[in-house]
């Protein structure tokens, strides 16, 4: 969580102090962002701040001032790469948390480590970089900003959100001529879900506080719609009934690369969209997908939402603890992402 100017002249117009109406100063003309990397086996990656820096000697997150026009996610990834050698391709985004003061903001970008890596000091802002077990974080002298946010951040590290989409039900809820080309309609829905997966979902949709979260999406296709697939280079991960469970990546699975306001390099950090092509009943495939999700991520912090208006299916998935939202809920989220 770097909020101090470098010792050399500013490299970007964002490298400047902002002063609030109460006289407090914060680093970053366009706001600032920090990266929290969580590895269940190692803990979280922390930066021991150089003594000459603001709140020097404390521990916080790699990060710093955002550049003009730069998203918080891009800024956090860039700063963590520069300061700590964090490889972007080793990360998957989980959620963001925002401190908004009106005249300045700080966004914490929380990610999961997909593979082990060793950080490396890249500039003079760090005395040390260390993986710290969760239970040992509070024993360190923490940067005041990070210390204030850590209890809430820690409480969310174990959360898991999955959205299972009844594609036939969602497509059929919008009279746009889908019946003329079921496969084409399914392909359009998949592209839209990929865009939403890349952009993330407002945390309030899951009853959480400010920020965004990146759920795992599974889209279940049946009948003629099973032929549907997005055009272009981007292809969601696919599985048929009985294939590997969501979260178990198969060889050759590719990550989504979606525009719609999301930088291509940032889209690579988002969870993959899983396409389930039902061999038989689509409802049975959805129930099986929900059951797999429950086994993969059990517990109070695991949320599974099934998008359907089918009452019988709703009752079946509710037996596994899944929530049910109607197609309109998902369509509103999709429209918000793809609208110019």
Annotate each PLM feature.
Residues 2-36:
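Acidic, metal-coordinating catalytic segment for phosphate/diphosphate chemistry
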Residues 29-32, 105, 213-215:
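Short, basic and Ser/Thr-rich N-terminal targeting/leader segments
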Residues 36, 50, 135, 168, ...:
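Anionic group-transfer/hydrolysis microenvironments
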Residues 43-44:
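Entry beta-strands of beta-propeller and related beta-repeat scaffolds
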Residues 53-57:
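A conserved beta-turn-beta hairpin within the catalytic core of GNAT-like acetyltransferases
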Residues 60-69, 177-179:
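Short histidine-centered catalytic/ligand-binding loop motif
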Residues 65-158:
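Unchanged
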Residues 159-165, 169-241, 246-340:
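Nuclease catalytic cores that cleave nucleic-acid phosphodiester bonds
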């Amino acid at each position: 969580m770097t909020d101090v100017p470098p010792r050399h002249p500013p490299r970007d117009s964002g490298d400047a102090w902002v002063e609030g109406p109460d006289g407090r100063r914060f680093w970053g003309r366009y706001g600032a962002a920090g990266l929290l990397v969580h590895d269940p086996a190692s803990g979280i990656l922390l930066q021991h701040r150089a003594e000459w820096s603001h709140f020097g000697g404390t521990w916080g997150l790699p990060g710093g001032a955002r550049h003009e026009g730069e998203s918080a996610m891009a800024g956090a990834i860039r700063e963590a790469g520069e300061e700590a050698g964090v490889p972007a391709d080793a990360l998957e985004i989980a959620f963001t948390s925002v401190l908004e003061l009106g005249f300045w903001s700080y966004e914490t970008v929380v990610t999961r480590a997909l593979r082990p890596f060793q950080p490396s000091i890249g500039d003079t802002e760090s005395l040390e970089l260390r993986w710290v077990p969760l239970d040992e974080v509070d024993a360190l002298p923490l940067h005041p900003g990070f210390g204030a946010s850590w209890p809430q951040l820690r409480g969310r590290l174990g959360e898991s959100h999955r959205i299972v989409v009844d594609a036939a039900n969602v497509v059929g809820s919008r009279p746009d001529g889908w019946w003329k080309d079921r496969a084409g309609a399914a392909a359009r829905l998949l592209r839209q879900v990929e865009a939403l997966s890349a952009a993330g979902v407002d945390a309030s949709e899951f009853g959480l506080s400010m920020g965004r979260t990146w759920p795992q999406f599974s889209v279940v296709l049946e009948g003629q719609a099973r032929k549907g697939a997005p055009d272009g280079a981007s292809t969601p991960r696919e599985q048929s009934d009985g294939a590997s469970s969501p979260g178990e990546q198969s060889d050759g699975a590719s990550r989504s690369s979606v525009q719609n306001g999301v930088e291509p390099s940032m889209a690579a950090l988002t969870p993959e969209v899983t396409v389930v092509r039902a061999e038989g009943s689509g409802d049975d495939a959805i129930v099986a997908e929900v059951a797999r999700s429950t086994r993969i991520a059990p517990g109070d912090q695991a949320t599974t939402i099934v998008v359907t208006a089918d009452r019988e299916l709703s009752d079946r998935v509710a037996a596994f603890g899944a929530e049910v939202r109607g197609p309109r809920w998902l369509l509103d989220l999709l429209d918000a992402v793809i609208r110019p």
